[in-house]
């Protein structure tokens, strides 16, 4: 908790999704004294821990930056809806990017070659391409050595996007 409070107190505005992910992950890594080897052995466990920690951190930032506003009546329904939409959109955006940031860290710990958000044909951007964009665009590179990964959460709401990025 001390690491969380220190991280929160360093920020005077809502941090970016990458800063939030990095901060939550660092808090967990430091709390448990994790090495890359330990993360590799139980990647699923630590991925879930990081996501949970980031969500808690995110809610603490919401309270810090929006708590006072919630205690004050809204002047109109439109004002309430606009405020609510701002919060909801931030939450939705954060959830998807959070997973991508944490997966990238796991791939890095495992010494995997990958690239995130590579622009492919028709301006599509799969979340990850293994081993990378250069190989993807190299027509002589064996297709069976390429992997595209769409990291979506929750998948039930995003299957159309996954199919689009896959070119289906």
Name every feature range the model reports, one short phrase each:
Residues 101-104, 108, 114-168:
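Catalytic core segments in nucleotide and nucleic-acid processing enzymes
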Residues 74-78, 112-117:
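Surface segments flanking catalytic/ligand-binding clefts of nucleic-acid enzymes
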Residues 6-97:
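Interdomain/boundary linker segments immediately adjacent to catalytic/signaling cores
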